[in-house]
Amino acid sequence: MDNKLNIVIITGMSGAGKTVAIQSFEDMGYFTVDNMPPNLIEKFVGLLNTPDNKIDKVALVVDMRSRAFFEDIQSIVTELTDNTSVNFKLLFLDANDTELVSRYKETRRSHPLAIDGRTLDGITKEREILADLKNLSEVVIDTSELTPRNLRARILQKFATSTESTFRIEVMSFGFKYGLPLDADLVFDVRFLPNPHYISELRDKNGTDQEVYDYVMEHPQSEEFYQNLMKMLVPILPAYKKEGKSVLTIAFGCTGGQHRSVAFAERVSAALREKWHLNVSHRDKDRRKETVNRS
């Protein structure tokens, strides 16, 4: 098993997509640092490259914002390439001049090397400075025709080490009376199912308790809904992954988030966990109990 520290330096033309790139690495579980001064990289790597360090993947953005320090980058890249105690890759992001000018016009920002606001002059100068560094890069991606989503997918394709690190599913339950979860991608309302709240011996239990789970699932409409739901979910999950989505949140809601939604979140997560990296949570499961305790 390779226990070496994995280091990726992200560099390239200003406006070529380094922000999207570093976010992509963060989604893959990398420790990320934006705008890292090149003269600090050696010391930073030394701090991480120790037996008791728990960080095993690092992605650093180094670009022309470092200005005076940038001249150190080539020698540092050479040192990291020759360092047998780390796994090192250099990622260079590029785009054609027309596209870069267009992106700067769209964002209304100034190129770091532009003189008197002349963006194209700044791009030309930067391209000359980075020419040797581009030649040293193990991975070069031209983003001229790529959307942010396409770029993210390309990076995942080239750098991801496992399916678990590139796509995961969050299944959650919630109560509509406490509001919709803001981060949910898919929301399913299960308030049409019989409510255990009206069964006295089930009222103070929740959907993780076997009695409540069985009560919810024993009704024919529960089984019909579950079967139809899985027929929909199974084919669309690979499509979400293919589009480069890192987290898909599937939420089930009932009135208070204690019984029906919890039971369904448990059942669906158990089925999907066989194939997908998945986490299940119950936002409002204990909210009623907490309210009673505070009163």
Swiss-Prot record:
Record: residues binding GTP: D63, M64, R65, S66
Q: What stretch or stretches form a coiled coil here?
A: none
Pfam families, per database record: PapZ_C, RapZ-like_N
Looking up InterPro entries in the UniProt record yields: P-loop_NTPase, RapZ-like, RapZ-like_N, RapZ_C
Which terms are listed as keywords in the entry? ATP-binding, GTP-binding, Nucleotide-binding
Sites binding ATP sit at G12, M13, S14, G15, A16, G17, K18, T19
One GO molecular function term of this record is: GTP binding
Q: Where on the tree of life does the source sit, at the highest rank?
A: Bacteria
The family annotation for this protein states: Belongs to the RapZ-like family.
Q: What does this protein do?
A: Displays ATPase and GTPase activities.
User: Do you know which PANTHER family this protein is assigned to?
Assistant: RNASE ADAPTER PROTEIN RAPZ
Full protein name: Nucleotide-binding protein LACR_1047
Identify the taxonomic lineage of the organism of origin.
Bacteria, Bacillati, Bacillota, Bacilli, Lactobacillales
